Amino acid sequence: MKGGLSPQNMVGLDTSSPPVIFVVGTAGAGKSSLVTSFQRWSRFLETEAIAVNLDPGAERVHYDAEFDVRDIISLTEVMNEYDLGPNGAQILAADLVAAQALDVADELHALSGELIIVDTPGQVELFAFREASSHLIEVLGQDQAAIIYLFDPMLSRSPSGFVSQMLLSSIVEFRLGLPTKNFLSKSDLLEEEELEKILEWSERLEILELALYDEAGGQRTEFAINQLRMMQQFSQSPGLTPLSSETEDGMADVLTFAQASVSYTHLTLPTN
């Protein structure tokens, strides 16, 4: 590791550094696809987005990663050296990356771009519930970081599946302490009626409550409704924004959220 860096000198605390957007969600929610599509979309608008891969278990990515954790951590080597299975190796790999957090921050902030978008590990718990992630966020600059949480569209079609994702998103926001906005990933896969229903659930709590009672009822529903009401009181970014990596719907919303959420004054949407 490089020496001579005190917390006061960390690049992440320099407000001239670009914002860092962590893309978080359950396995298969479309995190890598979003990073790929957002990078392509931003280049078309001549807005440079720096793509970062923090998933050591990714077999391949389709975006141009300016930093790829697989260049410094080999999951296979970790498994062999420490006699671990895939899950244990993923956890240890996250800790090994965190141990090099200052070097990672130096490398990222030496790059020229207007936004850093980070593809996190496939399993949400590997990013959200490890101290290594909190340390990495702190080094990169907590005041300049935010989270995009992706809802899986298939799971969102049922009231209980939708509420489960709302709860998980809130837990991630609470755990990492970053501004968080929810996006409905792969919205192009849904029928128009399904999409409208899900968006209505996200905007009108009373409609979601009725749907929960129709689906199940009982104590489980009462518990979910109580949690939802509490979440509604404290939510900083209510609602759900449709997002599609195929049609590029919602990409401008991602950029606008980044602009509004972090201490960075030079990031703007193109006017033409």
Predicted regions and their residues:
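Intrinsic disorder/low-complexity signal
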Residues: 1-20, 192-194, 199-202, 208-209, ...
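The conserved Walker
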Residues: 27
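Conserved small/polar residues in nucleotide/adenosyl-binding loops
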Residues: 265-271
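Conserved GTPase G-domain signal focused on the G5
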Residues: 247-258
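Conserved glycine(s) of the Walker
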Residues: 30
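Conserved catalytic-core segment of NTP-binding enzymes
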Residues: 125-226, 231-232
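Conserved beta-strand segments of the P-loop GTPase G domain that flank and frequently precede/overlap
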Residues: 23-24, 53, 117-120, 147-154, ...
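Nucleotide-state-sensitive switch-loop elements of NTP-binding domains
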Residues: 3-24, 33-36, 40-117, 123-127, ...
